[in-house]
Amino acid sequence: MITFSSLLVTFSAISTSLAIPGSILPKRSPMNFVLQRNESSLVRRATPNYEQDYTTGGDVIYTPSGSSFTVDWSTEDDFVVGLGWTTGSTNPINFSGTFGIGSGTALLSIYGWSENPLVEYYIVEDSASPPSFGTVKGSVTSDGSSYTIWENQRVNEPSIVGTATFNQYISVRSSPRKSGTVTVENHFQAWAALGMNLGTLNYQVLAVEGWGGEGAATQTVS
């Protein structure tokens, strides 16, 4: 789980358009992965049953319960929390709830990693004061909106395999939302069509990430 280090900028215009229809996919299994970050740690738990509250520069209170979680924060530090699956898939992800930002930068996204190649990926559904996401590669239309596709390289940064150099693949929705269905397969196919290939999927979560501000979110995931 890596934060973006670039200065905050306005999203660039879309350069390429790819439209991929949704497909009927099997339902997902129950949640079996809880993600929290305190400074640079990646923490995995088989059962979503814990609370995070750290005060280095501020407060983050994270409370998962079954397939739902709440998070309240007021901090200058980075945090990332999420709920999902130990192994990602192309199955659709349903999410519903709230995402309110008083100040600072925050993202509500589908978030995960792949290995071989090592890739960190985001499907950003809502955001506040978003940073630059790298280089615009194209776009994809899915779930009632266009998404700008970005690619970014991280050099000697923390990852799920330790300090490494890896790419980030990022889809950013043009009409933000706090609830809906994300057809993950559409994004994976659009990335692949642009030469942005994923490897073996590692964990995959609905994540709230924030830094330098305050806000609150409540989400249910399936």
UniProtKB/Swiss-Prot annotation:
* Family annotation (Pfam families): Glyco_hydro_11
Judging by the UniProt lineage, the source's domain of life is Eukaryota
Task: Check the record and name the PROSITE patterns matching this protein.
Answer: GH11_3
Residues of the signal sequence? 1-19
Keywords on record = Carbohydrate metabolism, Glycoprotein, Glycosidase, Hydrolase, Polysaccharide degradation, Signal, Xylan degradation
Residues of the GH11 domain: 36-222
Query: In the record, what terms sit under GO molecular function?
Result: endo-1,4-beta-xylanase activity
**Pathway where it operates:** Glycan degradation; xylan degradation
Q: Where does the record say carbohydrate is attached?
A: 38, 94
A biological process from GO:
xylan catabolic process
Catalytic positions are: 120, 209
Q: What is its EC number?
A: 3.2.1.8
Catalytic activity, per the record?
Endohydrolysis of (1->4)-beta-D-xylosidic linkages in xylans
What InterPro entries does the annotation carry? ConA-like_dom_sf (IPR013320), GH11/12 (IPR013319), GH11_dom (IPR033123), Glyco_hydro_11 (IPR001137)
Q: Which family does the UniProt entry place this protein in?
A: Belongs to the glycosyl hydrolase 11 (cellulase G) family.
Report what the protein is called: Ethylene-inducing xylanase 2
What organism is this sequence from?
Botryotinia fuckeliana (strain B05.10)
